[in-house]
Amino acid sequence: MTRPPIRLAQFGLINAYLVPEADGLTLIDAGVRGMDRRVNRAARQLGLPLRRVALTHTHSDHVGAIDTLMTQWPDLELLVGADDTTNLADLGVRTPPTRLLRGGDRVGSLTVIDTPGHSPGHVAYLDERDGTLYSGDTFVNVPRLRVASVLHAAFPLPTFGTHDPAQTTRAARALLDVPLRTLATGHGPAIPDPLPAMRRAVQAAESGCEPGVVTRTVSGWVGHLTRLGTDGAVAGKALAYRSGRTG
């Protein structure tokens, strides 16, 4: 009997998932700093070793516990989308990837699906045993299900962090053809029987005004922040928004 996956949520928003396999546990995404405590507690409760970390993408809220986990589990593997490695060093992650992933690759019971857009090498994982799709940030379920290219004031960071809004929307549409029973997103609770909600979210992103409004709005804000940063009027770097390092 297959053990169900475990959702580990920081602040109720930032998700990582422990997926039991025959040889131990696969961790999908690594949250922000402190996620290792949740991971290790769950691993002890399950009585299973952590074998690998498989990232959906390399943004700061998905890689925070990698280096700490690597010191705690010396044989741990780090799996990253082949086109999504450049951010790791910029984010201060010292651990190099063990394996680069492309669509169609297998990670235990998981099949890798290329979903570029939110980041250049974003990937999703489908567990064919139970039909769970780990979509990363192509879809966001805060405060309701939406494509990450669609801005919502309640939780705007995934949209600010989106590398290519139009490509993200196309990736979301492609996921409608995946035979899934549960959608597990990077932010917010999992959704059973998700296809109706996914279709509505994709249609909203393709509605003819919403994606354009989002793209123009985010681009305008980023441009304004960049100008203010250049003028010394704000503290910090607008680069995090421009390069899609958050969300």
Model-derived segments and their meaning:
Residues 87-92, 143-145, 216-218:
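Short, charged, surface-exposed secondary-structure boundary motifs
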Residues 26, 54, 78, 132-134, ...:
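Residue-level marker for buried hydrophobic side chains located in beta-strands
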Residues 33-107, 203:
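Active-site HxH/HxHxD metal-binding segment of metal-dependent hydrolases
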